Amino acid sequence: MSLFGVGFLAFAKGKRVCAIGRSSLGKISDPLEVPNLLDLQLDSFDWLIGGPRWRAALDAYRKNPSGAPIAEKSGLDEVFDEISPIEDSAGNMQLNFSKPVLEAEELSVRECRVRGRTYSAPLYVEAEFMNHDTGEIKTQTVFMGDFPLMTDKGTFVINGTERVVVSQLVRSPGVYFERTPEKNSEKDLFSGRIIPARGAWLEFEVDRHDQLGVRVDRKRRQPVIFFLRAIGMTDDEIRDAFGEFESISVQHEKNIGLSRDDALREIYRRVRPGEQASAEAGRALLENFYFTSRRFDLARVGRYKVNRKLGVDVDPTRMVLTRSDIIATIRYLAALHLGFSEVAVLNSNKSVPISTDDIDHLGNRRIRPVGELVQNQLRAGLARMERVVRERMTTQDIEAIIPQTLINVMPIVAALKEFYGTSQLSQFMDQNNPLAGLTHKRRLSALGPGGLSRERAGVEVRDVNPSHYGRMCPIETPEGPNIGLIGSLACYSRVNSFGFIETPYRRVVNGKVTDDIEYMTATQEDEHAIAQASTPLRPDNSFVDERVLVRRKGGEVEVVPADQVDYMDVSGRQMVSVATSLIPFLEHNDANRALMGSNMQRQAVPLLVTESPLVGTGMERYVAIDAGDVLIAEDPGIVGDVSADVVTVKQDDGKHRDYHVGKFVRSNQGNCYNQRVVVRSGDRVEKGTVLADGPCTDKGELSLGRNLLVAFMPWEGYNFEDAIIISQNLVKDDTLSSIHIEEHEVSTRDTKLGSEEITRDLPNVSMDYIKDLDERGIIRIGAEVGPGDILVGKVTPKGETELSAEERLLRAIFNEKSMEVRDTSLKVPHGQQGTVIDVKLFDAVDGEDKLGAGINQRVVVYIAHKRKITEGDKLAGRHGNKGVISKILPVEDMPFMADGTPVDIILNPLGVPARMNFGQVLETHLGWISKQGWKIEGDPDWAKDIRVREAQPDSRVSSPVFDGISEGEITGLFSSVFPNRDGERAVGSDGKAILYDGRTGEPFPEPISVGYMYVLKLHHLVDDKIHARSTGPYSMIIQQPLGGKAQFGGQRFGEMEVWALEAYGAAHALQELLTIKSDDVVGRVKVYDAIVKGYPIPTPGVPESFKVIVKEMQSLCINIEVVSDGEDDVSADAETLQIEEGLDTSPKVEVGSLEEV
């Protein structure tokens, strides 16, 4: 579901309908529609619960088995089959699970969000208990806990908040061989390891003496001949398998008399040193480590990788190791050590090529999507439950046992709760704008349980790998310590059933490009020559050039004859992610700036008025619809009634469908998510037509910012170092205004002294403060509130001494509550203000709401605040060009064009050359051209590739990534722009115009680049950052004010600032800052008293931090006494000094208190 509680799934294969006609200036026509951008999340979870998408994919695979095989069982079926049967130690009893079923959910997504509940469905499973002694079978359907469900937008609602489970990028199970240079010689050392999905590793290595050894479960190394004997190989079998490899033959001859039992004992001794070694113990050890499915699991993908790498033909459903796996691994390693290019497969007439593995290659890394992550957590919960079941089997009366009495579902519920609530991969959803949410769901993380840690990850694993092409974006990644560890899925990529990322290519047959699409993994792609999407083609789809530039394995580029090309890219945007594909002229930008542009688009706040970009890339409509924040028609029909909240459509099948419109909903980041209806009563709508725009969308297109008239010029130094000057018009017209909604919550609980109460009757509070509270004591909707205003009146009982009879009588007569209770009302925090737009009251006593233990009522108040653009706010373009507003100029002072049009924004031209993001200049030029409109007369050479010959003013155009309009074509279009009313073109063919100084009316001496750029307002708003403190909390130890806005702290006067005052000899100012303005506890109380009474400021005393350092030195047994000139002990207790000075009535700070003074 969407944020609004009612979501409408964008159909996966159909066209997205968009009201804006955007003209493409690209040369390539994409043969493949961009797939549904949420498929990664939706398909994976659907497999887990055995939903319709997975069943449809399985049916399609059975009819046409191509590509990676689809899993035959759902995730829930798999995990319950694995744990069945559970037997007691004697083998007399057995418990089996089958047929897991999810019932209907209790609450809708919208209700879960409002009530703070988890969107889930009860999970039931059929449990069968069998008594082997009597042959009796008891079957029951057992409740296994509430199972959190995914909404149709790929999110989970956990305790009322939307969360995303990020897919994890991990090393795939399988067999890997690597070469490491020997430190003290020029030799290379080779090793091979079998890595399971679950269980002990098995490692083989060749040492510097060319001896082949084995490590069991990463313990001490031992000769490989011991292991071969231990798994039951005879002398003849060893000679047949390894006779050609001297390193093994020599070992074999040395240990010719070694028996299997001796080998098992030796292995056990090395793996479990200090324990009694026996052949039986060694046999059990190896059996448990590598040959038992409960302890060792290669998983489907691991078996696939082992079979493919070693050429063995083991059953794909066999998840444990076989002798043939071990023999083939040792043969491969021995052949690799000898420098062979291929090795023959035993008992077969085929051979496999030999090479070492690049662990960072995407053929060796796989995705653990949400379904697998949840399945693993469920498996862990079931394993905990299994122990409880076995325990109960031995303690309960066997006659009275039924499945329900054996099963305790708490371990399963706890495991799922732990995963969704605290796992590193279950994250608070980024709802800053639709693109942020969509990107979050497509994110790939190498961190998390079973993954890397940012401290240990080196440069190699973070770096771009040639196999990322078309699978993982080489540009979009965080800038901080997570760089390279967190990535994003490329536009066209998909994840197969093994977890490997596939990307589509067009098949090339005899030098002719077909429209047959084939998805390939990174390993498959390495075997082919692939041409880029921009390679010129003739009308019959044959290559224009006889020799074509292609990619080969390892990213090598070469030119080959056209008939040797195997495949061709499907689109120019194939290699980049969704956010990066939204940057026009990406090909003209430095990659570092493109990275910043991709990340900053996710920080754009939804504006009051949305406007689609003049210059786009063609991806805007896909993002807007797939993100799920626009309302789209699910079936064709005629629009009936239309209101702000509901759109009714009479469908062609005669049914009426109501579409609920979300109004002023708070997102996770405090932004206003609001939907606006864009259809009218009587309109005809088709399936996929946009009914209502959401935040940051305009007629079904993503619209993160506004098109502003920009000039590249310096202006009085105000745009020095990326600072930005904007026009007062942008403030007055609310061009860059946004609404932000804050949520404030208060609960009443049962305390030892009685229950808290929500009331209007507050002790010692004047009527002015409660004038906007209703009779319940809750703020009315529409009230304007500021810092300190009461939102919800609440009183809490407080303990008292025993009252006399007279006092009790007076209390009863006059009903003085002030003595019994204290005011604990919910107030507007410091620095916040706005209008109350909604109030929600939840009651556990009278209502049906579940509020948790001890909570009687919960009130949630929503306050909205409109923020206009102001100095200190951060603006950015899509090319990594960012800056802070330094000056808002009156419109009459802004530079203006010859026709009197003032520019909206002035940027520093020095921000372009050093950053090498020239795309912003080309966007500015094309923005001007599309704003004015054009008509190409005749058939000039520069226009031969432009399909749009005429465009009206204010047209929307797209310049697709790596297929955009060229500089020569832009220059030509400048000469084809429609002239103004005077018959002149304000901007010349070089993209520059004469601007006039708004203050003097004089023209500037040089022509200036002018045009329309798409500008975003980022979430870094000055109102959230600016902070001031008068009085506030102090640190417990050193009694200095705390730091930071969150703690309502003070401004730090640090070491270097002290040096600055010392340099100027400002001794009194410095003394004041270091004592009475900071941590001279006695002195600051004296100053307060002096200011109140109008006395002169007294002399500062001793700071508390000085006393702390004295105490620290005394704790090191250094006897220190500090005495003043009058022989007084300076370190005397502060409270004593206060009493001596007679200041006992002044406010005090308790040591350790964070209360205000």
Swiss-Prot record:
One of its GO terms (molecular function) is DNA-directed RNA polymerase activity. It is an enzyme of class 2 (transferase). One of its GO terms (biological process) is DNA-templated transcription. GO terms for cellular component: DNA-directed RNA polymerase complex. InterPro entries: DNA-dir_RNA_pol_bsu_ext_1_sf, DNA-dir_RNA_pol_bsu_external_1, DNA-dir_RNA_pol_su2, DNA-dir_RNAP_su2_dom, DNA-dir_RNAP_su2_hyb_sf, RNA_pol_bsu_bac, RNA_pol_bsu_CS, RNA_pol_bsu_protrusion. Keywords: DNA-directed RNA polymerase, Nucleotidyltransferase, Transcription, Transferase. Its EC number is 2.7.7.6. It catalyses: RNA(n) + a ribonucleoside 5'-triphosphate = RNA(n+1) + diphosphate. Belongs to the RNA polymerase beta chain family. PANTHER family: DNA-DIRECTED RNA POLYMERASE I SUBUNIT 2. DNA-dependent RNA polymerase catalyzes the transcription of DNA into RNA using the four ribonucleoside triphosphates as substrates. The RNAP catalytic core consists of 2 alpha, 1 beta, 1 beta' and 1 omega subunit. When a sigma factor is associated with the core the holoenzyme is formed, which can initiate transcription. This is DNA-directed RNA polymerase subunit beta. It comes from Tropheryma whipplei. The lineage of its organism: Bacteria, Bacillati, Actinomycetota, Actinomycetes, Micrococcales.
